[in-house]
Design a protein with these regions (language model features):
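Cys/His-enriched microdomains
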Residues: 871-874, 913, 932-935
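Charged, low-complexity alpha-helical linker segments
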Residues: 909-927
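Intrinsically disordered, low-complexity cationic segments
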Residues: 824, 873-876, 920, 930
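Extended, charged helical/alpha-beta scaffold domains that provide interaction surfaces
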Residues: 326-334, 340-347, 549-550, 557, ...
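Cysteine-centered motifs
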Residues: 823, 934-937
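Basic, mixed-charge low-complexity alpha-helical segments
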Residues: 10-21, 898, 905, 909-910, ...
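Histidine-centered active-site/metal-ligand motif
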Residues: 125, 476, 747, 878, ...
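Conserved P-loop NTPase motor core
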Residues: 1-582, 632, 648-649, 653, ...
Length: 937
């Protein structure tokens, strides 16, 4: 603490002092609230809403509203908010982060600002890290809100669309960060407004805010579908990776060293940089790969896939560790959250890494995925009008919260003084010595009935310690990713006298560890950390499990110089010091210099990780700006705006683009390339092809005007084919949405490829982020043009079927399809794809675009007890209207280009291809169907 802080207090202390008059005001209202009956207290909600309508603000209502919630908590739950909890509630309402120690009642604190902000009627989201906590908090804390007349909802992983919508429409909604983000993405993929589940993002309170906004910031939310790519290459690369020999580099290759042409002496077939988690082939390794795959040059563009996959295989074998980064369960690879130790079902590593690990562990390799929609938590939570956060540890990341999220961190004083004793780190030479010391410490504490919580970083370590304790006859519980189902129960019992619990990382976070009287008298909960984490914040979270609400407790970290943190980031001088001191085996060292070295190593990693997250945000900000534009335009279409004028503008723009591209007034019309112009425009807008006669003696603008008139006339003729104009309006909306989605998905992939390669710009002394922005801008404009052209192409070539068939569709009966049964079934396979996301197959097809709530299996869509098939391209079905839309003048046939003569075989091939390109949507009451088989099949 510097001199300024000693005199004036820390910034948090000054903020708390500034808030105290407001707290005094809330407490002064306590006698008035106690006099009110339950009905009168409930009536305050109606009174507050009326006062808001009359012009008062939430800040005006705050003292009285908080006093009402405080009294309701006492009557409903028997829990009255402490003064420090009132302070925390005010901080959250102000859109800041309240750092509150473990056991200070953060869950109860959230009821204060959530009630106040829910009075506006726009919805409040209370965000937690898992379904268990969301459900628990909704059931317990929701009673306060319901008592006061507010509605409370909870969104869980297995809920259906209607249940989610009902929950989001409540005044206060408890939900996990993952469900919240995925629902946002799915809402921006729906075809009809009625399929939306979320309201606008108004105000959220994020519990464990550091876990969500810091730890998970590097992991984007992705909804994906299978890409159809073969998995054979992963198997081949895995075989080769096991044959390659790991070597060493004389020193790390920096960018400057590469630019200056410094030579790095390497041994073996590949080298591993564990700090940056990078694997590079040596020259010797490159030759072996080329020989294995019988290729001449691995660096050739055509061999990029092999190069990428062999790198993935080497990463899987050398940087991804079983029972640390992932577990194998039921012939499946399940990712372990590095910060919580929990399994993350349904999540998969992207870019082929998951498939490489599947090949390594000899489980079934699932096909690679294609990204359909993605967003990072950084950008998602910045969409809220206001957000607040709670955690036990945030001050160490205060700069990041302020720079990226514009949120201040305020330390809230504890209700009772913390009397936990935090011992100096115990440092040993080897891991073996360290683990022996840990077991001895557990045995010693257990002998006096003191409960012990042992925190490990990996599952492997937790199982090793479990075996060692068994040999000592110590009864204990193990809590890691393999046994996470019993998490809450095991953690809640960890404070009982004589209890010994081994937990991976912060498993059990959010569940209080309460001491019994015997345990309290034995010294309280003993925390033993078996390794320092990369982040000081995670270490502080582990320590914070002990000493809640003034309880006794103690903590100590046991470290060896063989730990990853010390090996990769600690100074080599420490090993020399140990050696020079002649430290005996099993001898423990405690020294200020050692503690400082460990802290400096952690600071170095924290700074490095912050840089990575900041860099990710710089790139994702570009994606986010484009995403905002696309989603905004998409929502306008979804909201039912009349698209006729927009379509006409697309027609005008498309004609302008190609006229300007192909014709010039500076060149005589006889020299214009009419074939090129007809080849690019007429497939989009079927105007009459231009000929030398039709353009003779005309200026460019004259031709432009004639083409626009003809294009508009053609579209008006198309509109006249529809019994009702609204049918075409509906079609315009559906087609445009489908084109936007299709092109946006491709654009996401292109942007990722661009980002992966843009780092090379640094070698040319150019800023990669600036280069990325410029390239992304050009790509975005190309995508917009492509959306317009595809939309027009589809709209100009749709055709309304005969009424009898339309009526059958409308009644949901089987429809005769003019197509080949065999071709149709061939198209089915591998086309309808469920989008895999966190824990679930997403309620949206990869290509078919079925609405949320459908279940996708083997190309068949089942919904509301009905059954149907979707085709290779987005289906077009005017909902509630008796119409079937197909492409081409006849189903399965496309118009011939004027003036072309084609053979019968060529015509047949084109007709067959057209059948496969046609959109079809068939809905029937069962599996019965009627198809015709083409001559070819």
């Amino acid at each position: 603490m510097n001199m300024f802080s000693k005199v004036f207090g820390t910034r948090s202390q000054r903020e708390v002092k500034r808030i105290m008059p407001l707290v005094e005001k809330i407490e002064s209202l306590r006698p008035d609230m106690q006099k009110l009956s339950d009905e009168e207290l409930r009536g305050k909600t109606r009174e507050f809403k009326k006062r808001l309508e009359e012009g008062e603000t939430l800040d005006d209502l705050l003292p009285e509203a908080f006093a009402v919630v405080r009294e309701a908590g006492k009557r409903v739950l028997g829990m009255e908010h402490f003064r420090v909890q009132l302070i925390g509630g005010i901080i959250l309402h102000q859109g800041r982060i309240a750092e509150m120690r473990t056991g200070e009642g953060k869950t109860l604190v959230a009821t204060l600002p959530s009630y106040l902000n829910a009075l506006e009627g726009k919805g409040v989201h209370v965000v937690t890290v898992n379904d268990y906590l969301a459900k628990r908090d909704a059931e317990e804390m929701g009673k306060i809100h319901e008592f006061l007349g507010l509605t409370v909802g909870v969104v869980l992983n297995d809920m259906k669309q209607d249940e989610r919508r009902a929950a989001y429409n409540c005044d206060v909604t408890y939900v996990t960060n993952n469900e919240l983000g995925f629902d946002y993405l799915r809402d921006n993929m729906v075809i009809y407004k009625e399929q939306l589940v979320q309201r606008d993002l108004h105000y959220c309170i994020i519990d464990e805010v550091d876990s969500i906004l810091i730890d998970e910031a590097r992991t984007p939310l992705i909804i994906s579908g299978q890409s159809g790519k073969s998995t054979k290459l992963y198997e081949a690369c895995d075989i080769l990776a096991q044959q390659l020999e790991r070597g060493e580099a004389s020193h790390e290759m920096t960018k400057m060293a590469a630019i200056m042409g410094e030579e790095v002496i390497e041994t073996g077939d590949f080298v591993v940089n564990e700090k940056d988690k990078i694997v590079n082939l040596t020259e010797q390794g490159v030759h072996k790969v080329e020989k294995f795959f019988h290729i001449e040059n691995l660096a050739d563009p055509e061999n990029l896939e092999i190069q990428h996959n062999i790198t993935l295989a080497l990463r899987a074998h050398n940087l991804m560790h079983k029972d640390q980064d992932y577990v194998v369960k039921d012939d499946e690879i399940l990712i372990v959250d590095e910060f919580t130790g929990r399994i993350m079902p349904g999540r998969r590593y992207s870019d082929g890494l998951h498939q490489a690990i599947e090949a390594k562990e000899h489980v079934k390799i699932k096909r690679e995925s294609k990204t359909l929609a993605t967003i990072t938590f950084q950008n998602f939570f910045n969409k809220y009008d206001k957000k607040g956060g709670m955690t036990g540890t945030a001050v160490t990341e205060e700069k990041e919260f302020r720079d990226i999220y514009a949120m201040d961190v305020v330390e809230i004083p504890t209700n009772r003084p913390v009397i936990r004793v935090d011992h100096e780190d115990a440092v040993y030479m080897t891991k073996k010595e360290k683990f022996n010391a840990v077991v001895n410490a557990v045995v010693e504490a257990h002998a006096k009935q003191q409960p012990v919580l042992v925190g490990t970083i990996t599952i492997e370590t937790s199982e090793l310690l479990s075996r060692m304790l068994k040999r000592q006859g110590i009864k204990h519980n193990v809590l890691n990713a393999k046994f996470h189902e019993l998490e809450a129960e095991i953690v809640s019992q960890a404070g009982q006298a004589g209890a010994v619990t081994i937990a991976t990382n912060m498993a059990g976070r959010g569940t209080d560890i309460k001491l019994d009287d015997v345990a309290r008298n034995a010294g309280g909960l003993m925390i033993i950390g078996t390794e320092r984490h990369e982040s000081r914040r995670i270490d502080n979270q582990l320590r914070g499990r002990s000493g809640r609400q003034g309880d006794p407790g103690e903590s100590r970290f046991y470290i060896s110089l063989e730990d990853d943190l010390m090996r990769l980031f600690g100074s080599e001088r420490l090993m020399k010091i140990f050696t020079s001191l002649g430290v005996a085996e099993n001898e423990q060292i405690e020294h200020k210099m050692l503690s400082n070295a460990i802290e400096k190593a952690q600071e170095k990693i924290e700074f490095n990780n912050f840089g990575i997250r900041k860099n990710l945000l710089d790139y994702d900000q570009v994606n986010n700006e484009q995403r905002e534009i696309i989603y905004k335009e998409r929502r306008q279409v979804l909201d039912g705006e009349n698209m006729r004028e927009a379509i006409y503008k697309m027609i005008q723009d498309t004609v302008d683009t190609y006229v300007d591209m192909c014709f010039s007034d500076d060149v005589d019309s006889e020299e214009w390339d009419l074939n090129e112009f007809n080849g690019v425009l007429t497939p989009i807008i079927p105007v009459r092809p231009l000929t030398a006669e039709s353009v003779k003696g005309k200026k460019r603008d004259e031709i432009r005007h004639e083409l626009k008139e003809e294009a508009v006339k053609l579209y008006e003729e198309k509109e006249a084919e529809f019994p009702e104009p609204e049918q075409l309006r509906e079609l315009e909306r559906v087609v445009l949405l489908k084109c936007i989605d299709s092109k946006w998905m491709d654009h996401i992939d292109d942007m990722e490829i661009l980002r992966q390669g843009i780092g090379l710009a640094a070698y040319g002394q150019r800023d990669p982020v600036v280069e990325y922005k410029m390239s992304a801008f050009d790509m975005f404009n190309e995508m917009i043009t492509s959306i317009q052209e595809d939309t027009l192409r589809m709209l100009y070539h749709v055709h309304v079927e005969q009424k009898i068939e339309r009526d059958l569709i409308f009644r949901g009966e089987a429809v005769a399809m003019k197509g080949c049964e065999r071709c149709f079934h061939t198209l089915q396979q591998g086309i309808i794809r469920g989008a895999v996301r966190d824990g679930n197959r997403a309620e949206r097809g990869g290509a078919g675009g079925n609405s949320a709530g459908s279940r996708i299996s083997e190309g068949i869509v089942e919904r509301d007890g009905r059954r149907g098939y979707l085709g290779v391209e987005p289906f077009l079905h005017i909902r509630g209207k008796p119409a079937v839309l197909t492409r081409g003048k006849e189903r399965g046939k496309i118009p011939e280009q004027q003036g072309e003569k084609k053979s019968a075989a060529q015509k047949q091939r084109e007709q067959d291809a057209a059948v496969q390109r046609s959109w079809f949507h068939r809905i029937g009451s069962g599996a019965d169907s009627y198809h015709k088989v083409c001559k070819k099949c």
